[in-house]
Amino acid sequence: SDAFVVPGCTSLMVPGDTEGAGALIAQNYDLSSVYAAAAVVIKAENEDGPDAIFYTSAGMLGCAGLNDAGIGVVINNLVPSDSGPGVIYPFMVRGILASVRIGDAIDAVLAKPRASGMNYVLCDGNGEIYDLETSANDYEVTCPFEGPMAHSNHYLQDRLKPLERRHWPARGQSVLRWGRATRLLKSIAQPDSEALK
């Protein structure tokens, strides 16, 4: 539908069963076509930690990925009003993918001085999924989930909503993508990787 042809990204989270089997995270990048020629998948070999593969654009350090310790990350840009000096998200993603344990991956985001807001969706090989909504100076963590969940480019946590920039023209499109993804996820009895495509 033409209603969804606006740049942005949407993440999907599907919790697994009690053993963690079937847990999934996914993301689409509805970016301007100008980025298509710069899209790359990179394998990073690390002597001091896990190797990782990640999706990014040429010149960036990483936007989404998975390491060989089973830690995965996808992201959604958020637009808080408290941006300032701090660590930018590509370095956060690299810190997440350098982690061996999910708790360390969470700390790679929450224990650092952040430059701005981002939504980080983390998952490990045991099926643990954590959604980290952040601003430069605050955060909220969602886990466990009551079924599948979607996230786009606006804050979902009530406590963080006042931090969102007031004059942000793409908010409506973000709400639209989030609503559509949420409805589609709820319409599938047990979402799997094929259904998320």
Q: Predicted segments — roles?
A:
Residues 1, 16-24, 28-197:
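C-terminal, well-structured catalytic/ligand-binding subdomain of enzymes
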Residues 1, 5-10:
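Active-site pocket-lining segments that scaffold enzyme catalytic pockets across diverse folds
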